[in-house]
């Protein structure tokens, strides 16, 4: 029997909505990255974008375990000498709660064109509402 390789024309994508309230950041991010990549499907092919669209609501209610809410710091650099910026988790949660989850998922995806394309299928909203009712998303309950 030959190995099955999915073609881009054979891909069928679903829309899933995930409620992030009370969920642990890393565990939720791994399940989202699996959905985006398509690894939950029996037709998974590494070189083909066969994943689904994911909508995450209530990103502001995501949880970290232990002392990470007080200790975690996000870093970015401007590219200039002395241009290192530090943002504590609590400040990032207050200003941009959707960036926390997007960054965690982004770092779990491939670091190439495929990863950037997969990340474009992720929609994150801080509150409980989203404008994607026309796509009829299915509720996804993370295991």
From Swiss-Prot:
GO CC list: cytosolic large ribosomal subunit
Keywords (A to Z) from UniProt: Ribonucleoprotein, Ribosomal protein
InterPro entries on file: Ribosomal_uL13 (IPR005822), Ribosomal_uL13_bac-type (IPR005823), Ribosomal_uL13_CS (IPR023563), Ribosomal_uL13_sf (IPR036899)
GO biological process, one term: translation
Gene Ontology molecular-function annotations: mRNA binding; structural constituent of ribosome
PROSITE patterns, per database record: RIBOSOMAL_L13 (PS00783)
Subunit field text: Part of the 50S ribosomal subunit.
Family: Belongs to the universal ribosomal protein uL13 family.
Role of this protein: This protein is one of the early assembly proteins of the 50S ribosomal subunit, although it is not seen to bind rRNA by itself. It is important during the early stages of 50S assembly.
Protein name in the entry: Large ribosomal subunit protein uL13
Protein source organism: Chloroflexus aggregans (strain MD-66 / DSM 9485)
Gene behind this protein: rplM
């Amino acid at each position: 029997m030959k190995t099955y390789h999915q073609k881009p024309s054979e891909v069928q994508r679903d829309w899933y909505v995930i409620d992030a309230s009370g969920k642990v950041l890393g565990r939720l991010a791994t399940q989202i990255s699996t959905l985006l990549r398509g690894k939950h499907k029996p037709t998974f092919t590494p070189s083909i974008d066969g994943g689904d669209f994911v909508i995450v609501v209530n990103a502001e209610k995501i949880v970290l375990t232990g002392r990470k809410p007080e200790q975690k710091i996000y870093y970015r650099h401007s590219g200039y000498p002395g241009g290192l910026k530090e943002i504590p988790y609590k400040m990032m949660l207050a200003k941009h709660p959707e960036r926390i989850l997007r960054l965690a998922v982004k770092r779990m995806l491939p670091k190439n064109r495929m990863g950037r394309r997969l990340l474009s299928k992720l929609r994150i909203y801080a509150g409980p509402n989203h404008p994607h009712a026309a796509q009829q998303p299915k509720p996804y309950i993370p295991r």
